[in-house]
Amino acid sequence: MLLLPSPADGRGTAITHALTSASTLCRVEPVGRWFEAFVKRRNRNASASFQELEDKKELSEESEDEELQLEEFAMLKTLDPKDWKNQDHYAVLGLGHVRYKATQRQIKAAHKAMVLKHHPDKRKAAGEPIKEGDNDYFTCITKAYEMLSDPVKRRAFNSVDPTFDNSVPSKSEAKDNFFEVFSPVFERNSRWSNKKNVPKLGDMNSSFEDVDIFYSFWYNFDSWREFSYLDEEEKEKAECRDERRWIEKQNRATRAQRKKEEMNRIRTLVDNAYSCDPRIKKFKEEEKAKKEAEKKAKAEAKRKEQEAKEKQRQAELEAARLAKEKEEEEVRQQALLAKKEKDLQKKAIKKERQKLRNSCKTWNHFSDNEAERVKMMEEVEKLCDRLELASLQCLNETLTSCTKEVGKAALEKQIEEINEQIRKEKEEAEAHMRQASKNTEKSAGGGGNGSKNWSEDDLQLLIKAVNLFPAGTNSRWEVIANYMNIHSSSGVKRTAKDVIGKAKSLQKLDPHQKDDINKKAFDKFKKEHGVVPQADNAAPSERFEGPYTDFTPWTTEEQKLLEQALKTYPVNTPERWEKIAEAVPGRTKKDCMKRYKELVEMVKAKKAAQEQVLNASRAKK
């Protein structure tokens, strides 16, 4: 602190007092270029002075302007101002070599240079001919600047840049040089991405993560490319609101279609690259090798575990096998013994049957009349078929140890017992069939005059007609009805409707009832046609030594086997019917011959019925 010097001796000190006003508060705001620079530095987070940054920016832009060399567009003066939309705006301004990379400052500078050179006033002063109004080519320069100076319009034009290569390399082109072919294509198309930092294609040494990021980016590519520049209609030219809406709707649909085609192009590009990428193949092979190694390791561990289990299982199986073989051997021995016994019994029955035939033959079948002899032969065959071994032995002992009269009496007694047994079986079957028929008629509820009074003969005739005229016959049910009306002895006229109703009711019968009806029909047929044997032209009549004929109806499979055997063994084949019988299991030679005769008669009857129906239809016409 500075103090005044003390006064000299003898001198006084003069003190002056003055009054001062009170302090006042003032609001002062910072202004000036330095404060402006401070604020801009703070906002831009820059340490250098704002003026230095602005100077550097201006210097860089000026250097760019100095370096920018405009290209002369040779076709400029030949452009049609009315067709300005189809011109290359960058080429018009001399920026064809820079294109979408040109800055706004460069566009402005290029336009300024073009104006100084091609303005109508300049050219007019130089003595060049000019066109009036918008017909001069200078209009193309103005339109180009309008399009490129507006960011929205420029983006629309960049989307349809005529110099952009939209081609997609094929798989064959990139077979040997994948990276050289696809790298520039992806680099070229990356300009359409909304996202920055577009991943590169990379090279053969790229990691799996980098390749996965690359393809994930391009498979989910977000493009800003739009096609409004190609709109055929301009809504500004619309005369009313409805027309403007219609134009907007048409333009939106066209843009959407072009956008879809663009995304399909990008997808095709990515698909082709993915399918040709050698790294993908390498990664798949590595993954496959890894899985194979893991699989082999698991298989090896499982194999060792299975070996231990297999040893234990083999021991158990061996013990079980030995026990099973022992059991099977016992069963086989028992079956062999049973088969031997059965064969012995068959041989014994066959021997006794032959013995019975020979005994009867020795006594000339106990008759001097040919018809009675044939009938006795049939009865003997019936005995051979139905008698058991003990009964056959007893009967043979009687025949060999007695006189002719006693033997005949014993034989007739045995025949009477068998016939009585057969008669009882038939009566039971007929009663069962009648009861079933009554139940069926009650359940059917009647079907006209023809649905009542169906006799047993009519039922048998209906079954025969249904089998005679199978499905597929023309006017089948009319033919069946006509056949029944011709051959029926009841005198009742049946219609096709009556026949259909009765056939449906018979179909509801159980298999045993159907078999009984079929047997009934066969017995009736035999009674009518089997009394006097008829000679077959295909083979001579002969005595049958086989077992008694079975009356079981022929199945479809047996019918097919019989037809095939008839084709296989023609008429001139020696022992034809023996071979045919061998081809049809379960049927004897006599069965096959009788079935053949039945089929011949059925075919003849079928042809006659069809001929009658045909004649009736012709008569109606």
Swiss-Prot record:
Q: What is its main location?
A: nucleus
For this UniProt record, give its keywords in alphabetical order, as a comma-separated list.
Acetylation, Activator, Chaperone, Chromatin regulator, Cytoplasm, Nucleus, Phosphoprotein, Repeat, Transcription, Transcription regulation
Cross-referenced Pfam families: DnaJ, Myb_DNA-binding, RAC_head, ZUO1-like_ZHD
For the modification Phosphoserine, the affected residues are 47, 49, 60, 63, 183
Q: N-acetylmethionine occurs at which residues?
A: 1
User: A GO term (biological process) for this protein?
Assistant: DNA replication
Q: For the region Disordered, what residue ranges are annotated?
A: 294-315, 427-453
The UniProt GO MF terms for this protein read: chromatin binding; histone binding; Hsp70 protein binding; ribosome binding; ubiquitin-modified histone reader activity
Q: Which PROSITE patterns does the record match to this protein? A: DNAJ_1, DNAJ_2, SANT
Out of the domains of life, which is the source?
Eukaryota
Query: What positions does the domain SANT occupy?
Result: 449-511, 549-604
Q: Modified after translation how?
A: Phosphorylated in M (mitotic) phase.
State a GO cellular component annotated for this protein.
cytosol
Q: Where is this region: ZRF1-UBD?
A: 160-250
Q: Where in the cell is it found?
A: Nucleus; Cytoplasm, Cytosol
- Which residues are in the J domain? 88-161
How does this protein assemble? Component of ribosome-associated complex (RAC), a heterodimer composed of Hsp70/DnaK-type chaperone HSPA14 and Hsp40/DnaJ-type chaperone DNAJC2. Interacts (via ZRF1-UBD region) with ID1.
Q: What role does this protein play?
A: Acts both as a chaperone in the cytosol and as a chromatin regulator in the nucleus. When cytosolic, acts as a molecular chaperone: component of the ribosome-associated complex (RAC), a complex involved in folding or maintaining nascent polypeptides in a folding-competent state. In the RAC complex, stimulates the ATPase activity of the ribosome-associated pool of Hsp70-type chaperones HSPA14 that bind to the nascent polypeptide chain.
Question: Per the record, what about its domains?
Answer: The ZRF1-UBD region specifically recognizes and binds H2AK119ub. The ZRF1-UBD region is also involved in protein-protein interactions with other proteins, suggesting that it may be masked by some regulator, thereby preventing its association with H2AK119ub.
Q: What's this protein's name?
A: DnaJ homolog subfamily C member 2
Q: What is the lineage of its organism?
A: Eukaryota, Metazoa, Chordata, Craniata, Vertebrata
